């Protein structure tokens, strides 16, 4: 969706064999192997102190990890030694937080499945609901069904997925964009099967949206901030097994990393859709990774079923985000 540094006892580790035959994603595509991504891909347990269905890991410039406990209604604060404390207790009007991102000015923004878009002033630990799709930033039809994930571009705008109520049999999921001035537009009005993660390529010319309900990742060209070319959108990758892709991140080379919920793995794709392989969590780690975030040479992975954060050393730095690497 800890305690690696300063704790006694052996690390919990798993090794992905770069020479092993991984699942074929996509069918007919090239399989590149993980050596250039994470070497032997040793996965270490970082912490299991945070609870409440973990999601949305983001790092600030000081190296503090922030993430949500969905059921607890909190934003956890995790220090570099893996100690987890409540950083922000969300107010009652912000229900089921699901995604977080830092803006350029250091403000933390988030989306909540039961509420809408919110901002957080970390200096005061105060969270404020800023758009709910109805009375705040409203649309005549009520706007939001239930927001799931968020990504902030270099223009200060925010893409966020609207997933609640959508599925493979009810493809009513949406995508919204809030520009730097606070204006919200609906840029995909239905047709998505539980849109979950959303991320931009490093040059911000391609937007990736994954559909949990369809077990696939879509790609659509970006014309300008908040303006996409749906006529040239396509299926970027189709996953096998599990339930579906949850949230995503990207590295500085444009490779896409998707948390494959139900499969205990992070799947990695090249910008052209070729499949590198799957970074597997260790046996017994839980099957439900929800998200991943780069920091200081590692990819940190949240796993929901056992409220644990794992990490794997990577060879390519992550996409530059406002919180810092």
Q: Where do the PLM segments sit?
A:
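A short helix->beta-strand "capping" segment at the edge of beta-propeller domains
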Residues: 20-52, 233
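A short beta-strand motif characteristic of beta-propeller blades
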Residues: 42-48, 83-90, 126-140, 183-189, ...
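Beta-rich, blade/repeat-based domains predominating
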Residues: 47-65, 70, 91-116, 135-158, ...
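Beta-propeller domains
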Residues: 66-89
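Short loop/turn segments immediately following the C-termini of beta-strands
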Residues: 70, 112-113, 163-165, 212, ...
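A short loop-to-beta-strand structural motif that recurs across blades of beta-propeller domains
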Residues: 74-76, 116-118, 173-176, 216-218, ...
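Short loop/turn segments that connect beta-strands within beta-propeller blades
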Residues: 79-83, 121-125, 178-182, 221-225, ...
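Glycine/small-residue-rich hydrophobic helix-like segments
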Residues: 221-290
């Amino acid at each position: 969706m800890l305690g690696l540094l300063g704790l006694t006892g052996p690390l919990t580790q798993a090794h992905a064999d770069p020479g092993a035959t991984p699942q074929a994603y996509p069918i007919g595509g090239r399989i590149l192997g993980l050596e250039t991504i994470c070497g032997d891909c040793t996965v270490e347990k970082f912490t299991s102190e945070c609870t409440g269905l973990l999601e949305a890991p983001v790092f600030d410039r000081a190296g503090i990890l922030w993430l949500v406990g969905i059921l607890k209604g909190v934003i956890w604060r995790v220090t570099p030694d893996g100690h987890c404390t409540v950083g922000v207790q969300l107010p009652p009007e912000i229900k089921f937080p699901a995604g977080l991102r830092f803006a350029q000015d250091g403000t933390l923004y988030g989306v909540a499945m039961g509420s809408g878009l919110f901002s957080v002033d970390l200096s005061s630990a105060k969270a404020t609901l800023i758009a709910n799709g109805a009375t705040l930033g409203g649309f005549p039809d009520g706007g939001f069904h239930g927001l799931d994930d968020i990504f902030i571009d270099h223009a200060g705008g925010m893409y966020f997925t609207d997933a609640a109520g959508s599925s493979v049999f009810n493809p009513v999921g949406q995508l919204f964009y809030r520009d730097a001035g606070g204006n919200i537009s609906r840029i995909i009005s239905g047709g998505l099967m539980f849109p979950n993660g959303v991320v931009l390529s490093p040059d911000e010319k391609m937007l990736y949206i994954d559909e949990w309900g369809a077990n696939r990742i879509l790609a659509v060209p970006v014309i300008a901030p908040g303006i996409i070319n749906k006529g040239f959108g396509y299926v970027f990758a189709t996953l096998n097994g599990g339930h579906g892709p949850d949230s995503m991140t990207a590295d500085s080379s444009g490779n896409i990393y998707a948390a494959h919920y139900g499969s205990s793995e992070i799947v990695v794709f090249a910008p052209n859709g070729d499949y590198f392989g799957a970074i597997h969590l260790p046996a017994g780690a839980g099957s439900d990774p929800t998200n991943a975030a780069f920091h200081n040479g590692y990819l940190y992975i949240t796993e929901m079923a056992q409220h644990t954060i794992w990490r794997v050393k990577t060879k390519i730095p992550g996409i530059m985000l406002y919180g810092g690497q």
